[in-house]
Amino acid sequence: MNMALISLAIDYKKSPIEVRSEFALSGLDVSMLYRSILAIDNVVHAVILSTCNRTEVYLEISDLRVVDDILVWWQGYVRNPNYKIKDYFKLRQGTEVIMHLMKLACGLESMVLGEPQILGQVKDSYTLSKKNHAIGKELDRVFQKVFATAKRVRSETRIGHCPVSVAFSAITLAKRQLDNISSKNVLIIGAGQTGELLFRHVTALAPKQIMLANRTIEKAQKITSAFRNASAHYLSELPQLIKKADIIIAAVNVLEYIVTCKYVGDKPRVFIDISIPQALDPKLGELEQNVYYCVDDINAVIEDNKDKRKYESSKAQKIIVKSLEEYLEKEKAIISNSAIKELFQKADGLVDLSLEKSLAKIRNGKDAEEIIKRFAYEIKKKVLHYPVVGMKEASKQGRSDCLVCMKRMFGLNVEK
């Protein structure tokens, strides 16, 4: 059976958080998901990946028309009927799927360029697919090559070491000031796009606690709900939250300072304000125990890393392209070897039956020379039957390229 490799994706590039939340498959019974998707006609194998920034389904299928059935399956898990998957999903096919998965596992498709968490998430998805007997040989080979590629990118580049955004750079500054973030409490003010990105960076550092404060608590709750050490709060709770916090990062739209010196005591804190207009009073930095950074400080970090980022990303891309070429060459060899094996099996089948009949006749006293001549004639006819039919059909269709190919296969003169 000829199978095609495809993927369907909902990700942050096309879909905001509220859309991604609707189409997320995380939190559902994994075994049930695999049973239901594999029950769809023409779906042969599957791997389901669901993270905060994306939900993607990788599939081996026997008919491309099954895509519509898969979309219906996915839509069935959406709580709000106003969200239609056809408005948001991206379809990839063949080599594009493998290239995307390699870039994804290496962190090149992430909100945070080079972030390492995605590789672990891809590995977890692969493991769950195997556990549910949902992965086939070809898809397995794809993922093994992806993991090897990601390992090589990690060892041969510094793609995960260069701050690539205001949010990531802000966290870099915070790390410089505090030795052991795992014992610290972090307060993020604002749950917009930058606030969400800050939250993702902070979770990667595994602090003791993350507090996310926002005007509307619902948005903050959507972001924090999947994390045990995270909590959502109203902006009105800031005085109490600041007392607990060791690091305060603001990314919020306000017209006046929402954190001033009156909120803080003698406890040392790191204040990082990436809001415009500023949300944290710069005078906080004048207090001896505090460290204060604003957008200009962060931009300096970004500027320092521009060339590094470009260079490391370019190195990673070259490794991925090379790795994809290696994979495709190996797949060609596998397909070729499989075809050769099948050809020999076919030949064995043609020869064995005729040979046994011929030997039986010789054992029964028939003329051996005549039997061997007849055997050779029958084998010649059987072996050449399908090639002759193929050549006639190619000639009818004007496929001179096929004729040339078949001539080469049989060592014939292609010039005639």
Curated annotation (Swiss-Prot):
Query: What are the residue positions of the site described as Important for activity?
Result: H100
GO BP annotations of the record are: protoporphyrinogen IX biosynthetic process from glutamate
Q: Where does substrate bind?
A: T51, C52, N53, R54, S110, E115, P116, Q117, Q121
Q: Where is the active site?
A: C52
* Catalytically driven reaction(s): (S)-4-amino-5-oxopentanoate + tRNA(Glu) + NADP(+) = L-glutamyl-tRNA(Glu) + NADPH + H(+)
Against Pfam families, the record matches this protein to: GlutR_dimer, GlutR_N, Shikimate_DH
EC no. given is: 1.2.1.70
Q: Any idea what job this protein has? A: Catalyzes the NADPH-dependent reduction of glutamyl-tRNA(Glu) to glutamate 1-semialdehyde (GSA).
Instruction: Fill in the subunit field for this protein.
Output: Homodimer.
Domain comment? Possesses an unusual extended V-shaped dimeric structure with each monomer consisting of three distinct domains arranged along a curved 'spinal' alpha-helix. The N-terminal catalytic domain specifically recognizes the glutamate moiety of the substrate. The second domain is the NADPH-binding domain, and the third C-terminal domain is responsible for dimerization.
Q: Which family does it belong to?
A: Belongs to the glutamyl-tRNA reductase family.
- This chain's protein is named Glutamyl-tRNA reductase
Instruction: Give the organism the record lists.
Output: Francisella tularensis subsp. tularensis (strain SCHU S4 / Schu 4)
Taxonomic lineage:
Bacteria, Pseudomonadati, Pseudomonadota, Gammaproteobacteria, Thiotrichales
Q: Which gene encodes it?
A: hemA
